[in-house]
Amino acid sequence: LVTAFDGYTATLYPMTADLSPATGHAVTGRVLALANTNGDLAGDTFTVRNCDVVIADEVVATTNNDGCFTIPSLPAGEYTATLRYAYGYDRTVTFTVADSDLDLGDLGMIVCNFDKDAYINSADYAVYYASSGSQSGEADYNKFCDFNHDGYVNASDYALYSAFSGCDLSSFSYENN
């Protein structure tokens, strides 16, 4: 209790603090572009940026420039999350949070589904082709076609697109990716 002295007045401000332990565990992961339909990852520079992690229709995390995400605190239980990327084919991930933090590791994703349908077709190619051969700063450069983020839309990026060209994604499974 604070008391007044030497002509000063004192005011008591009641405060509360919740010092109970956290009720959940962090869940982390990294989203990378798939290199092919076999499920091979394209590599560490092919990160999927600004990919939302959605649980129960709520965005709980978003990937950063390194493709990494952190869901800060989930209580123990089973979860189904959707990786939702504006130019990719959505992926569902199921995981169980137990009594410690959980790292989901590297998760592959198809990143060249520009029109968000279940096909990698001429509509997607038109988006890629419009940016092909360009570099950052040029009017026709599209950063979403620069899959490895090196500032150029070139053969490295085309190899990734062409691996999925013509794919009917409605029958594609992320099971082993």
Which ranges hold each PLM region?
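Extracellular acidic, Ser/Thr/Pro-rich low-complexity tracts
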Residues: 4-6, 134
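Extracellular fibronectin type III
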Residues: 7-22
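Cellulosome-associated attachment modules in secreted, modular CAZymes
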Residues: 23-46, 51-54, 59-177
